[in-house]
């Protein structure tokens, strides 16, 4: 079933959605390669990639952001194909053994996984700052208040016992916020300022 651009299956597994969007993105990337074969300005490639390819790979990612290595690599493969092409057009030496994160940095891009994490955290920030109004989601945010001083300084209490629950949006983003110790930034910074802060934390 497809609802608002996201493919759902009865077991709430988003592998089908990821396969669909990667397939369509690779097709669009192939189209871009054909129509830009005489272009030389890397900025033009970035504009087309961001507008026609990457947006497909990030639409509603808060819902389907994968945790499995296979799905993460499947998505990153699209950007790797783009980087290989833009390296060739920019006369930058490309070889298969080059570090992917290093190549992303060379062209001022972040990995798709990093961008999905940023999108998750930005949505949580909007939720806590009441930019997004959702009583149900705000009710899922539980603060951890220990009865005595502990070494564990995590702010959010994450309720999840099964893997499917852990992979859903709220447990996933609260766990990430705990890991990065972002509570003060989440509740005290407005979205634009918070986005600048959190973007610097990811490759």
Language model feature labels by segment:
Residues 1-203:
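Hydrophobic/basic alpha-helical segments
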